[in-house]
Amino acid sequence: ASDVYKRQVDASSVNAPDVPETGVTFAENSLLKARAVAEATGLVAIADDSGLSVDVLNGAPGIFSARWAGSHGDDTANLNLLLAQLSDISSEHRGAKFCCAASVASPNGFEAVEYGELPGELLTAPAGEGGFGYDPILRPVELNGENALYEGQYAGKSCAEIPAEIKNSISHRARAFEALIPQIAAALAS
């Protein structure tokens, strides 16, 4: 595995194309990006697409998470719009999860996608300064309750209030890429 890290290159360093996210799922968008970079560079490529899925919104904002309020990447506007949309929703109906589809594609056509999720509950107001996006309003379920990870040390905390190394260890991206490792090895061997 350490050899893989020695050989990694950033997409921008090989003039990889900027790929429009035209898919209708996280998996489709992730594969579009990995496939385009693999085809353009002749290298094995990995990519991901991720976002927030809110139960009472039937999975929205989903693939539109980064542009929920209209402008791509306006985290504050996205977060404020979502909170306004959920303002009359009681705490027992504020279930949500961060979702990630991570993919690998090789120039010879090998493709694979793996998924990761971080289930949680949405707070009614932002809490914390860390992270980005919707981190200030998602409280991870597994850090709360009887079987809480880290002995309940982070109970009640949003993703923006917990240390980055803790958040990263339980994140949807970490889980998706951990699941993708065998597929990356297979792509490199293909």
Residue map of PLM features:
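Short, small-residue-biased leader/transition segments that mark boundaries at the very start
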Residues: A1-Y5
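Anionic-ligand binding patches
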Residues: K6-S190
